[in-house]
């Protein structure tokens, strides 16, 4: 199955970040490399997006085995 995001690779900065949040809420986690591939951008771009989004959303990253980008389920924040 082709990821939905990859079908429309030319997204604005705002739209890419909005869809990145949606993808993370749907999956709960993913790797930077996989997200970069799906959004048709570099890993560096995804890392920059994550740094900005961490300021407003419960996103965190983990390096190493089992690492990636994670988002906390909003129901767990209460």
Annotate each language-model stretch with its function.
Residues 1-78:
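Short, basic/aromatic recognition patches that contact phosphate-bearing ligands
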């Amino acid at each position: 199955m082709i990821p939905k995001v990859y079908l429309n690779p030319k997204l604005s900065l705002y739209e890419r970040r909005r869809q990145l949040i949606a993808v993370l809420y749907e999956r709960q986690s993913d790797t930077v490399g996989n997200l970069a591939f799906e959004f048709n951008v570099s890993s560096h771009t995804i890392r920059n997006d994550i740094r900005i989004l961490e300021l407003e959303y419960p996103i965190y990253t983990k390096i190493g085995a089992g690492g990636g980008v994670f988002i906390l389920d909003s129901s767990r924040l209460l």
